[in-house]
Every structure is written in C-alpha cells, then in structure tokens.
C-alpha cells in the first residue's frame, strides 16, 4: 500500500471488480510502487506478464479497481491468507497511484475490501507484511481497527532505512 490519507478523508471513487482489461492502467503505478522498494517485498523489474500474474491471482481471489473521473487510481485484491483450514481468514493488498496519494483512495479501498471480505464469509483479515516505515499505511490500518500483533525485526530491506521490521496486522470481521 502506498497511500494513506493525511486525516480521516475518504475519497469518492467508484470501486468495482477489475478485469484483465484494467491491467494496462494498473501496471504503470504497480511498477512504480514495486520498483521504488519502500512498501512491497516483491522483486524489482517484474515484466508486465510477471506482475499481472502476481496481482491477478486465480479464484477465490478478487481484484478491484478504484476509478476517479474515468481513470484507474488504485487497486486492491482480497483472498484467503491460507488454504484449507486457514481459509476463513482473509488477506489483502492495496496500491494507489502515487500521483494521487493522500487523498483517501486507500481508505476507500480499505473500507470496500473489508466489507467484501465480510460478505464473502471471512471471519478476520490479516496482513503479514506491512513495512513499519510505511507509516501512512500503518496509521490507516489502525484507523480501520487493525492491531499490530507482531513485528518481525529486520525482515524488509528498505532502500533508505536499511533493514526494518514487517508488521503482522489483524482485525476481526465477525462479532463471534
């Protein structure tokens, strides 16, 4: 996730299921975010096809896009954190076009994906790798009731800060 609003702003964007036809609009900011190396532990320099396979995972994964004035400005995906007996817990990933960061698009996607995960029957949501220096994402997830369960020290090689921790964050989606 590359974006978090500076306050409690939530953008007014259309969020819908993505199709592979959306990939040409997603890939430029996907590549910018991944190659920047500050928020995602993915290899730098993924080809268009490699990146598409990373983002568009097969069912039961769902991928969404946020649209503002006809332009794809963000994307998210949600699916099970584990197969089998762990499939009742969701995980998700989020990206917002860095040119549109700080406007609440990440918050809008976050709320949307939480609602979708709940409607799909997931009982909780867990993020396994929130970079601790990505403070806008950490703040956003905490505002959306995620708690930091643990921080894995020196698990992420940040291009400026060196070895930093990865937070495992969690929130319940059901009341039971």
Give residue ranges: language-model regions.
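Terminal substrate-recognition subdomain of acyl/acetyltransferases
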Residues: 2-11, 94-95, 129, 152, ...
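A short beta-loop-alpha structural element at the N-terminal edge
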Residues: 13-26
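Acetyl-CoA-dependent GNAT
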Residues: 17, 39-99, 110-112, 116, ...
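Conserved beta-strand-loop-alpha-helix junction that forms the acyl-donor binding cleft
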Residues: 101, 127-137, 155-157
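Conserved acetyl-CoA-binding loop-helix of GNAT-fold acetyltransferases
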Residues: 102-117, 139-143
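Conserved GNAT acetyl-CoA-binding A-motif
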Residues: 117-130
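Conserved acetyl-CoA-binding loop of GNAT-fold acetyltransferases
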Residues: 142-152
């Amino acid at each position: 996730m590359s974006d978090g609003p500076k306050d409690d702003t939530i953008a007014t964007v259309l969020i819908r299921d993505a199709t592979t036809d959306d990939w040409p609009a997603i890939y430029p900011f996907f590549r910018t975010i991944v190659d920047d190396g500050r928020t995602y532990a993915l290899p730098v320099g993924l080809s268009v096809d490699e990146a598409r396979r990373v983002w568009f995972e097969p069912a039961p994964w769902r991928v969404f896009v946020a649209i503002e004035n006809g332009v794809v400005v963000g994307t998210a995906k949600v699916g099970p954190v584990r197969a089998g007996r762990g499939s009742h817990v969701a995980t998700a990933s989020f990206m917002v076009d860095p040119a549109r960061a700080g406007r609440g698009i990440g918050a809008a996607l976050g709320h949307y994906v939480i609602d979708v995960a709940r409607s799909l029957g997931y009982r909780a949501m867990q993020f396994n790798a929130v970079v601790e220096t990505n403070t806008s994402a950490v703040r956003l997830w905490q505002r959306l009731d995620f708690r930091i369960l643990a921080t894995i020290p020196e698990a992420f090689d940040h291009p400026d800060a060196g070895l930093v921790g990865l937070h495992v964050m969690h929130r319940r989606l059901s009341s039971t």
